[in-house]
Amino acid sequence: LIPDIFKFIPMYTLSKTERLCSKILIEELLASELSFIKYPFRVVYKISSIPGTHPARIAVSVGKKKFKRAVKRNRVKRLAREAFRLNKAILYNEIQEGKTIDILLIYLDNTIPTFAKTEKAVKAILQKIVARYSSEINQE
């Protein structure tokens, strides 16, 4: 029994259920038409009315051609997930109950970014998704 005051505090965690791991779901997401580029990421997302445990799920992809070593690919993925974890409140506050957004971030650059650069890009991405989401809701 959590007091109401704690419901408005964003959770700064990124659980397993908030990550997209299913190959089938990622393939469905890649077939989605909703995408844009916010350098250094290409963003593909899908809004669905299937209720889930969390309002948003995320996956990060880094190409093997850009970074040969898995250590470097994992570093970029870790930075992107951390930036999402800290800023997901931007997205969570706007999503209606019963809706979910699946997000795939595809890294485009050839260099390992700093956390500040990654966080700035992820914030801009989340704000753009919120803007597109709210305009889509207003059209319905």
Language-model regions, residue ranges each:
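Positively charged, solvent-exposed patches that mediate nucleic-acid binding
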Residues: L1-E140
